């Protein structure tokens, strides 16, 4: 059995909640507090709690919950894990907060055939949560030695990626996936504006990072920027 957490840097961990197919992330602080990035599906809280205990921590040590965006594979476990934690601060981009607070998915891109076709399929649902702190592009949070917010809209209106400056790790969210054997775009069927998603991912080329971490797929410990650059260009 694989470990419930995978260390990326001394204070940054990847938490596979459905194998490497869906990941959350922990950032630990010297004061013992933890930041959680994305909460996975509704079934994920059990895995998140197990991961916390594996690190010899308590769920109440999670003081901040950050989101890349509001789809159910990122926010499905939010209400439950927040209930377990207590009253953490909850962060999302200012253009994404409305979806988290309503429990509704952002609109789909009907200009692409996949989005047009899938508009009739049921969307994953999640219980609404209260966003306490609204993020903006280029904001640097005092988390883990500096966590920069990169607004990468397109997958959703308020989709963000995060740059963990201390370890030079980019957390892409759903801007791009890593299937292990190749890097790929997110599925157009689940984007609000697929073309915009591809355009805003080019922001990654101007960032200083070596490790690339993905919500969907294993992280690339070394040479992550080079591999992303090859894909993006």
Positions of PLM-derived features:
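Divalent metal-coordination and catalytic microenvironments
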Residues: 11, 27, 38, 48, ...
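Conserved beta-strand hairpin/beta-sheet module of binuclear metal-dependent hydrolase folds
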Residues: 2-55, 161-173, 178
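Residues at alpha-helix caps and immediate loop-helix transition turns in enzyme cores, especially N-
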Residues: 47, 77, 224-227
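Active-site HxH/HxHxD metal-binding segment of metal-dependent hydrolases
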Residues: 43-45, 53-133
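Metallo-beta-lactamase
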Residues: 7, 41-43, 96-153, 192, 196-209, ...
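Short acidic, glycine/proline-enriched helix-loop-strand junctions
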Residues: 88, 221-233
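Residue-level marker for buried hydrophobic side chains located in beta-strands
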Residues: 35, 66, 90, 169-171, ...
């Amino acid at each position: 059995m694989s470990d419930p957490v995978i260390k990326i840097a001394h204070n940054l961990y990847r938490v596979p909640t459905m194998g490497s197919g869906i990941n959350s992330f922990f950032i630990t602080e010297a004061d013992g507090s933890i930041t959680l990035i994305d909460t996975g599906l509704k079934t994920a809280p059990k895995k998140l709690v197990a991961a916390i205990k594996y690190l010899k921590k308590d769920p109440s040590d999670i003081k901040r919950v950050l989101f890349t965006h509001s789809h159910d594979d990122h926010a499905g476990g939010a209400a439950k894990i927040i209930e377990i934690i207590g009253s953490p601060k909850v962060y999302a981009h200012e253009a994404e907060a409305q979806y988290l607070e309503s429990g509704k998915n952002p609109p789909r891109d009907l200009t692409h055939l996949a989005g047009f076709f899938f508009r009739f399929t049921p969307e994953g649902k999640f219980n609404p949560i209260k966003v306490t702190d609204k993020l903006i592009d280029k904001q640097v949070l005092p988390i883990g030695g500096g966590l920069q917010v990169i607004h990468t809209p397109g997958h959703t209106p308020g989709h963000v990626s995060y740059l963990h400056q201390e370890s030079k790790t980019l957390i892409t969210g759903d801007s791009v996936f890593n299937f292990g054997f190749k890097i790929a775009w997110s599925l157009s069927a689940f984007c609000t504006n697929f073309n915009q998603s591809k355009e805003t991912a080019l922001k990654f080329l101007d960032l200083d990072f070596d490790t690339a971490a993905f919500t969907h797929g294993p992280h690339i410990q070394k040479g992550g920027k080079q591999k992303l650059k090859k894909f993006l260009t």
